[in-house]
Amino acid sequence: MRSIISAFILSLNFCTQPLVRGAPSAADWQELQKAVEGRLFTAEPLARPCFSTFQGKSVEPNVEECSTTKQHYLNSTFKTAAYAGFVHSYNEACASNVTDQCLLSADTFSTNGKNTSGTAPLTGPCNLGMLSEKYIAVSRAEDVQAAFRFAHRTGMPLSVKATGHDYAARSSLKGSLALWTRQLNDIAFNPSFTPVGGSSSPIAAMTVGGGANLGEVYKFADRHNVTFIGGSSGTVAAAGGYSLLGGHGTLTPTYGMGADRMLEATIVTPDGELRIANAHMNSDLFWALRGAGSATFGVVLNATFKVEPVMPLTLALMSFNSTGANTGPFLSLLMKHTNIWAEEGWGGPMSMSTLALVNPAMSVDAAKQSMKEVADYVSAQGGTVVLESLPSFYAFYTKYVEAASSTGTGAATFATFRTLPKRLHQSEEGRAAMTKTFRDIKAAGHDTFIFQTTPNKFPYEPGSNAVHPSWRDSYWLVGTSISWSSNDAGLEERMRVAAAVQEVSKNLTDLAPEGSMYPNEADPWTRNWAKEFWGEENYARLVQVKRKYDPHGLIGCWKCVGFEDKLMETESAFRCLGAFQKKR
């Protein structure tokens, strides 16, 4: 069966390029500017005001703008408020060309949000990197339709950026016209929503603009006395990124993934049509959007999600100082209790010396019993144990998550995370294999992060969306993150980091070949990425949907549906990351 599917995919000969290719003329740009009513802009890097040269030409630094950028350079809210701002610098800089970037080094920006000294212009390279030269600040469907007409007529490729909280450089593309959707941030609550064309009983739902971030969505939901189920990073676009590639968080075990909770989407497809996609209309597109929809099948203007009532949560928060010898027993305890905790509805992150799990259906007294053995161990290590009741998810988010999720974005951090099948927890051999893999990762100098955020208790209908099936047969999503030491990192260091990320990916794949890489937090150099992100059967179906709605390949991104590995060598836009791809 596998070989048949693989042969079928190869035989599709998918067209990834527009009908015509060539540089748009001045008249083309003028016509586009008129069509989008002045919302076409010329881009420059966020740090450009600090430099005296840009793209090899002398420019005037702007001391005031430079000071503001330096002051907030580590703040993801500040960065994602601008087209040129990205949480991870390889989205705006060409990773494999250390001169094709315009970044601030650690000795020039503030690490505490205070003003920095020095007004002299910086002397390093300042070039466009991965940024588009032109972008449209999208505010309506007609802007997107105009962009698709422009792309079809001129051959200019398109890219889509919502907030730019992106681990795989999917929201930027050198040489493209960018569609920046951050201004599509309207949010509405409907206590009795019914999908267009449907006849099901109305349910409470929120309609979220493609550029609205999770922090904004959580605040809005709390004001309307409901709970929006999402992740931990407030600057991630709820409808424009998080849910389109799956979406997991602390409440996922009980309430499902972001893709599971989407009821309807409004999208402009590359043929210029404004479409409603749900279970009753354009159902093939709706299936694909929920799990594989990032900058692939069109531009999502908004999406509607089921919401839950406000609910009290019980938090179990534990940590201790690692001595090396005391992490093994702690990991064994996590493995021992994982299946029980999954049935009880606990969800959240863990590591070799920490635990932060949330439960929407358990009292503090019951939690004390559930967590007793682990809490006793942590206390014996001189650690901290907190068991606390919180009145709502928003109370938990604002107290424990919000501040931490908006910092630490100065350089380049690469992630690699994989689902681990339940079978590994169900035998001594499986638990020993996990322990060895985690130790190998630690020996290589990297920390292992464990997310008990798979949808174990959610009543999923098999095959109802494009999320990889392994999520339904896993307790844990496991991986690590590895960063360059600074934005000044040389090519040799960048190559070492890329190799290290790929080595951890190999370790995790060897441990659990039937698992999957999570597309939102995947190794950018994932091999066999179509299978790893979605599974071969899903991918064959996804390519058919792509061909139907985007037959000329007007829109695309790094290792999204329709991407071909040969583009890493033939297209300069993809060589920035492709140069680090290991060949095995």
UniProtKB/Swiss-Prot annotation:
Show which residues constitute the signal peptide.
1-22
What this protein needs as a cofactor is:
FAD
Which key words tag this protein in UniProt?
FAD, Flavoprotein, Glycoprotein, Oxidoreductase, Signal
Q: What induces it?
A: Expressed exclusively during fungal penetration of host leaves, the time point at which plant defense reactions are triggered.
**Which terms does the record give in the GO molecular function aspect?**
FAD binding; oxidoreductase activity
Q: Which InterPro entries match?
A: BBE, FAD-bd_PCMH, FAD-bd_PCMH-like_sf, FAD-bd_PCMH_sub2, FAD-linked_Oxidoreductases_BP, Oxid_FAD_bind_N
Q: Superkingdom of the source?
A: Eukaryota
Q: Which Pfam families match?
A: BBE, FAD_binding_4
Domain FAD-binding PCMH-type: from-to ranges:
128-310
E.C. number? 1.-.-.-
The positions flagged as glycosylation sites are N75, N97, N115, N225, N302, N321, N507
Statement: the UniProt record of this protein carries the keyword rRNA-binding = no
UniProt pathway annotation: Secondary metabolite biosynthesis
Give the PANTHER family listed for this entry: FAD BINDING DOMAIN PROTEIN (AFU_ORTHOLOGUE AFUA_6G12070)-RELATED (PTHR13878:SF91), GULONOLACTONE OXIDASE (PTHR13878)
The family annotation for this protein states:
Belongs to the oxygen-dependent FAD-linked oxidoreductase family.
Function, as annotated: FAD-linked oxidoreductase; part of the gene cluster that mediates the biosynthesis of a tyrosine-derived cytochalasan acting as a fungal signal recognized by resistant rice plants and leads to avirulence in Pi33 resistant rice cultivars. The first step in the pathway is catalyzed by the hybrid PKS-NRPS ACE1, assisted by the enoyl reductase RAP1, that are responsible for fusion of the tyrosine precursor and the polyketide backbone.
Q: What is this protein called?
A: FAD-linked oxidoreductase OXR2
Print the organism lineage: Eukaryota, Fungi, Dikarya, Ascomycota, Pezizomycotina
Q: Gene encoding it?
A: OXR2
